[in-house]
Each structure stands twice: as C-alpha cells, then as structure tokens.
Amino acid sequence: MMKAVARSRQWQRWVCSSCLSQRAVPAHQRRRFSNSPKSAAVEFEPIIPASHAPPLYRDEDNTLRSVFDYPRFWREFSSHPGGVSVGLFRNAYLKEPRGFLTFARVSLKKARAVVSKVLAASSVQEYRAIVRDLDRLSDILCRVLDMADFVRVTHPDRNMQRMASMAWDMVYQYMNELNTMTGLHDQLAAAMANSDVTAVWSEEEKTVAEVLKLDFTKSAVNLPKKYRDRFVELSSEISAVGSAFVQEMAPDQDVIVLPSSDLRGMDPLQARELTRGGKVHLPTMSGQAALALRTVHDADARKLIYYASRTASRRSVELLEHLMRLRAELATLSGFESYGHLALRDRMMARSPEAVDKFLRALAENNRPKAMQEMAELLAEKRKAYPAVKRLDPWDKDYYSDLIRRPLRLTGRQGDLLSPYFSLGVVMQGLSRLFTDLYGIRLVPKQPVVGETWHPDVRRLDVMSDTEGHVAVLYCDLFYRPDKSPNPAHFTVRCSREISEAEMAEVWQQSKQDPDVPPFASPEYAANDGMTFSRQPNKTIKQLPTIALVCDFPQPSGHGEQQPALLSFFQVETLFHEMGHAIHSVLARTSFQTVSGTRCATDLAELPSTLMEYFAADASVLGQFARHYETNDPLPYRMVAQKVRQARRFEASDTENQIILAMLDQALHSPRAAQPDFDSTEIFHGLQRTYGSAPPDPPGTRWQGFFGHLSGYGSTYYSYLFDRVLAQRVWEVVFKSGDRGAALRRENGERLKESLLKWGGGRDPWKCLAEVLGDERLAEGGEEAMALVGSWGSTRQN
C-alpha cells in the first residue's frame, strides 16, 4: 500500500561522461551529468541591478548573506541563553537518542488505530474517508522513516544514528506487513468501486487512491498466500543481492603496472606518487587512471588502462545477472511481462517499456548527427599526429577530447577568478531574490533554539510567502566536516499535509492518556509532534514541509575567518540543483502527503532541479547577485560563458553514452532476463555497436558490472535524459531561454508554478506538461507523447 520512499533518493545522479571510464558506484555517490543552458553561451556584460527586495525585506536579505559569509555574525545571531532542548527539528520526542524509539512506538500505536478504523469502515461516509485515512497512515509511518533516514546518514552523534536505525527498522517491518494486508486492499477497492463515494473525491484524492492501489498491486497483495510469501522472500533476496552487487563490485585487475616512461603526458607529481622501483602502480578504478586515459601520450599504455578499467570482475557480472533474474521472477509472480513493466506502472510518466523505447530511439535519432560530427572532429585531431589512420580506438576518445578542450579551459590562476564572485552568502541571496521574483517567496534566517539542529554550523531558514506567510522550513548543513558525506543531498524530512480538526482532537486526547507522549502546548502542536505548522485562511492546519540541504562547501577561511566560503561555478550549479528539489517541496504543499512535493512521477522529479541549472548560468540571474566579495565588482559574464562552452564541448557524445546506458537498463529488465541464454555483456556490446558513434568496447571487457545504478534505479535510468529534455523545453518555451530578462519575470514563474510545480504528484503530469508548454499533443501521454519528447533532443545548438 505504501512504501518506504526515501525522499533522499532525489540526490542520486546518473553516470557523467567523465565517470564512464571508472567504476560505477552507488548512485548517491555520483554528481549529475553536466547540463548548462543555451543562453550561457552568449557573451555580453549584463547590467547589474540593485536588489529587487522591498525596503521591508532588505534587512532580511542582508542577514541572509551574513549568516553564511561571516562566522562571527552567525555566532552572535544563533546564540541563545540556553534552556531545555526542544528536540531535533523541534520534534518533541527527539530530545535525546532513545527518544527515537519512543517516537517509533507511539507512531505504531497511531498507525494501528488508523488500520482498525479503515478495516471497520462500512458506511458510505466511512468509505469516503478511506483515502484520507490511508494517507494519514502513510504520513504517520513516513514521519519516522524519513526523519530516521536523514539522521542515520547525517547526524554526527553515533548513538543518535544507531537509535534512528533501530526506529527505522521497527517501522519498516510494520510497513512490510501492511503492504501484504489484504483487508486494506479490499477496503480501498470497495471505496473506489462505489460511485457514491468517489463522486465527492477531489482530483487529488482520486490520484492518491490510484497511487495506493498500484502500491498494493506491486506488493502482490491480490495473490494467494503462498505466492505472497514467495513475493516477500524474493523481495528480501533482491535487496540482499542488490546490496552485494554494489558493495562487492570490483575490476578483474586491481592494479595496472607500467614503466614510468610509458606515462609521459600525465601529471608528473601524480605519476611520481605511484612509482615504486621504476614502475608505476596505477589503481584500476581511480581518478589517476581516468587522468591517464585523458593525458598519457602512449596509445599502448592507454589501451592497457582502458581494458582494465572497462572490465568488471566475473563475480560482479554474476551478481548483476542474478539480480536481473530475481527481478524477472518477481515480475512474473506479480503478473507482469517483465520487471520493466512492473516498475514503470507506478508513478512513472512513461507507463511502459514500449514508451521508454520510443523516447530513447527518438532521442538517439535526434542526437546521432551531432555525435557523429564530434567523432569526426576527434578523428581529425588524431590525424594531425597520424595522418594515415582510418579510425578511432576506444582508448582515443578521452585523450583527443581533452586535447581539443584544453584551449577552452580556464587554467592556472584564471580557474580561481570565478570563485570570488560566488561567496556562499551571496549565492544564497541570489537564490532568495530569484524565488522572490518568480514565486513571491523568500528565505529568511531564523535563530535556532536549543536542540533544534544537529550541528552548530546548521542554519535554519524560514520560507516566507508574500501572500501565504510561513510556508516551509529549510535547514542548511552546507559546510565541510570530516564526519559528513561529501555528496550533495536534499532530504524531505517531513511532507506537507492537511490535518483535520478530528485528527487533532484524537491526538490531543491520546497525548493526555499515553505516558509515552510528551506534553504539548496545544492540539495543533500535538498533531505535529511539536514541529512547525501553519494555519490556512480557511482555518485548516497544515504541517509544513521540512527540508534539509546537505553539501560539503569549504569553511570560511583566512585570518580571523575574514574570507567567506567561496564556491566554484560547479558548486554554484550544485546548490541551484539541490535548491530546485527544495523549491518543488515548498511549492507543492498538497493536502495529501502521498503526492506532496517531490512525491510525483519519478521521471518528472528531476525536472525542477535540472531546470535550476539553467538559471545558475543565466546572465540576468547572475547579475542579481554575483559580485566580488572584496571589491563588490560585478561578475564579468564572459568568464561564465567560457566555462559553459568548455563544459558543452562533446555534449552529443556524452548524451549518446547516456542513451546507451538507458537502453541497457531497459534491456536487462526486459523478458530477456528470464531466458536461459541471458548474457548482459552481449547485450551491452550489441547496444554500443547499434547505437554508438564512438568506437565500442572491445571483446573481453565487461563494463556493465560497474553500473551500480542498476541496483537502485532498475528500469528507470532513462528518467535523467527525459528530464534533461523537458527542462530544456521549459527553459526555451516558458523562460524564452533567458532572453531579455525572461528568467526573472513573475508571470513566467507563476506559469510554471500554477501549471506544474504546485501539483506535486496530485495531478496527471502529462496534463501539467501540456499546460505549462502550451502543447496539447502531450495531454494524454502514451507512446507518441514519449516519442515527441525524444524528438526535441537535449543537445543545444551552437
């Protein structure tokens, strides 16, 4: 019925082109594929406007910069007289680690009460409430799961992590029981079949009902008990094998040993660090090996490195193929033709593997001429040294690409010239100003209270609307710490949801009777576990989206911490990308948590974040905030344009790689996985030969054994390509590619918000796209709509 949808999954990225020669590690260890906007290639110096903030907001705007850029200011701003802890995120249960277990126990009591209510429903009135009741049940469980999921990977206190993991396990086990509970499925089906019930449901309620119904179907709840038991066994085995595949993936050859003379062209300092007894010992799956493929002059040396870095161990491939076969069995058990058919039925715009195939083929056709042109450029570059050669070898691509890119690259001191214009506080100012222009919301620093945050470096920002007041809470843990993951991440710690008066009264009564429940000041706080809420104009109560952003930007430095944290342009893109997820959570404040925020179609979830990367490189947007931290001089935009041009070089070839990987994902989750002669290596090499312009991998290699994304994103890897195309289309159609300040116009932001962002997953995403793009061909979705999107392409014209 409901799943432990880890909202942290949004930070997972696909395999960027620079990583294709390395081991594919878990998706959360990957940065997204580079995606820079068309307008960024235009060289001009924009007029730098003053802040658009009204006088009332200018103090907030200045404070926003100061809390991130000036440590002394932050220490004074965040200081408090002490007192009793209010609990992590102001959750009254989480004042100490063992509070997590109490939180889980109380939540399970609430959940069982809701289950009993749903199972007892018999009247039309009771059936009308079933969707709301099941959504509340999901929210009760996800409050624990999402909070615990965040804490166990981010909190610096190991004991807190341990208790969070225990709480997560308690609730997840109960959720698995619910997923195979036939009574809940039957009651939902009865409600959906009764026209007197559905006649009063809103569009959002009907969408939630369909989502919950699909969740039940995918859990095999409608099957006889022995098949349900096998379903549970298979699910457990798939989880174990998937984890083993990711954790044990390894190359066939761990180290490549070469004479040091063979590595001419490589950074001599790095080569020297790896040299022992006149031989270079190069770890196969390392940054140094990837660097060698780009810079070593000797083609034979590059060939050895290429073979080693593209050949996974036989054990890795065996685990991969075992995982695919188990998924195929699970799909058959559940009544689906393949795992791809099973996976794409739930919260996916594509809806079927056939539609994904239409999209990928159309995209490949659009991209192929540009990819072939890029390969011709590489061959021409190779012929400068070897005039008689007729073809490129697989180990040539990175080397000659790097040769062509070098003149475009900002090198030496030039590479550091962008960072002084991007202090972290200034970038946060820019984001707030952009959101004010587009959506009428702003980021306001809020003094944290005792126990609210997990580290003194964490800043709390309240998201304020010009018309609706307080709409979300954003916690920013953006500075490097030794105990932190280096991966940028967005977590939805709590979703938006409307809370009824009856629910508040019930929880308030429980708080007075259950000794495990801490004291609360009011029914509203009791219903929100002490966390922040808002009262709507119609007097209803909504739990506010609570979001955490985690990055690893440098700490302020210099004498007396006078130099703020300065970001590279890459880090600016990263922050804009993650804030795109956050703004989706903020704007999609639905009445039901099942469809709130980023709980939309999986292949739509990356659209808002990918779109934000276009804003990060737009001249008018940068003109609003990018100034030198010492001189206050405006950013020379030509420097950004040069950076973008370098990143876009060989973009079509990079896209082609992604298309082939998405096709591989589809093929491995097709009915072929259940056949006796299933061979993942043959499938991968066949796709390269059929759809690749670049030279395919040579026989003997097995790169697919490094494709860790196959574990977590089975049959949905195409989503990143899909959202790249959609983001580019929205940028061009809605924001006019940033022309004449279109990226800052309120009417354009309102169009995006009202047509798409505010709905979360509560409306058919194809209807949202058709409305925002003004293209009715998309309204019904299906295979032809997927093919149409693919035909638009994702590689910008020069």
Task: Report the location of each language-model feature.
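N-terminal mitochondrial targeting presequence
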Residues: M1-T63
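C-terminal, non-catalytic "cap/extension" segments appended to globular domains
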Residues: H52-L56, E60-E96, T102, G430-L443, ...
